[in-house]
């Protein structure tokens, strides 16, 4: 029998004690319950994220939100056609709101430096919520 195959005896164990300490770990930050964001809160954050020069990640983190979530909300808003980003060359915010028909099936509403585009068949209550947030 080689040394590795020899059965361990009390005399061998007596000279080679090993001590193991079991550590338990807890997360540094406990997981919070997911927050429910209202449509108005989402619209406000998306509007801020669409501002020229906006730092989307910083905006998200300032609200305790994962940046990927705000990017997803922004992407959804843009793909829906309900909002559009303004470019850096956009004029300074104006003090009035403009409402225009863009063809027969689309309306465009400008509130300050935010442009809201919606289909003519948009739910008025949903549009009102969006407009309250971007005012």
Swiss-Prot record:
PANTHER family: TRANSPOSASE INSC FOR INSERTION ELEMENT IS2A-RELATED (PTHR37936:SF3). Residues 1-36 are annotated as: Disordered. It comes from Sinorhizobium fredii (strain NBRC 101917 / NGR234). One of its GO terms (molecular function) is sequence-specific DNA binding. Pfam families: HTH_Tnp_1. One of its GO terms (biological process) is DNA transposition. Coiled coil: none annotated. This is Uncharacterized protein y4rG. The keyword Calcium does not apply.
